[in-house]
């Protein structure tokens, strides 16, 4: 049988094909690096808010529980942004006679002017969302915190932040890594909002973190799924 030979005019195309292949590899590598770069994933994103609210003071120094402001986190898919009324509980403005209806913590502070304006007009403060997942991603706060996933697992040490920033990458790979091995991220439910609580200095029921997590996962049937429909509904 006679062998098939490519015509000579094909030879230059081999070089073009090689260059195109190399360019494709470089492009794929560059895109892979770009989409996994912390800047692309918004790690460190720290927007200026209309009110300079300090979590370091409120959650850190004053030890306010996360649920005082984000009061739906254990019951709902979304952690509520606190209404102005929550702020007014402590920062009640003074009336014309200088009398405050509730607690008078810095009632005339210029930094709290947007809060007082919001209270008087009934218009919500225009907070800027920091942890902003894509619209095609479903995330349920209640499911996670009720299972024993602490706020700091996803948000970092909020209680040490003067201005809140995105501390974790919140990428699909990052989420899946936890779903595949949730044990190291679990703690007793009563310590979920205690951001300074740590297994390194604590034991629960005489067990270390690894032993407790294994028992907890069996008792509460924690077996996170990783198929697409779990988060993309």
Enumerate the predicted regions with their spans:
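The canonical Cys-X-X-Cys-His
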Residues: 63-72, 84-94, 150-157, 174-181, ...
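Short, solvent-exposed loop/turn segments at secondary-structure boundaries
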Residues: 78-80, 164-167
């Amino acid at each position: 049988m006679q062998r098939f030979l490519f015509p000579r005019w094909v030879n230059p195309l081999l070089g073009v094909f090689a260059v195109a292949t190399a360019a494709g590899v470089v492009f794929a590598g560059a895109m892979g690096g770009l989409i996994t770069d912390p800047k692309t994933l918004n790690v460190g994103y720290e927007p200026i808010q209309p009110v300079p609210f300090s979590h370091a003071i409120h959650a850190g120094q004053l030890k306010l529980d996360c649920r005082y402001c984000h009061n739906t986190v254990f019951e709902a898919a979304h952690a509520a942004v606190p209404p102005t009324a929550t702020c007014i509980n402590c920062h009640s403005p003074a009336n014309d006679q200088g009398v405050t209806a509730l607690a008078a913590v810095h009632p005339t502070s210029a930094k709290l002017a947007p809060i007082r304006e919001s209270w008087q007009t009934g218009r919500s403060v225009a907070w800027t969302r920091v942890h902003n997942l894509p619209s095609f991603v479903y995330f349920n706060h209640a499911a996670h915190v009720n299972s024993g996933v602490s706020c700091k697992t996803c948000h970092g040490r909020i209680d040490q932040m003067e201005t809140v920033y995105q501390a974790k990458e919140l990428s699909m790979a990052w989420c899946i890594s936890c779903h595949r091995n949730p044990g190291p991220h679990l703690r007793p439910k009563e310590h979920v909002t205690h951001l300074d609580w740590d297994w390194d200095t604590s034991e629960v029921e005489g067990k270390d973190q690894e032993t407790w997590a294994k028992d907890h996962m069996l008792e509460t049937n924690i077996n996170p799924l990783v198929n697409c429909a779990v988060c993309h509904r």
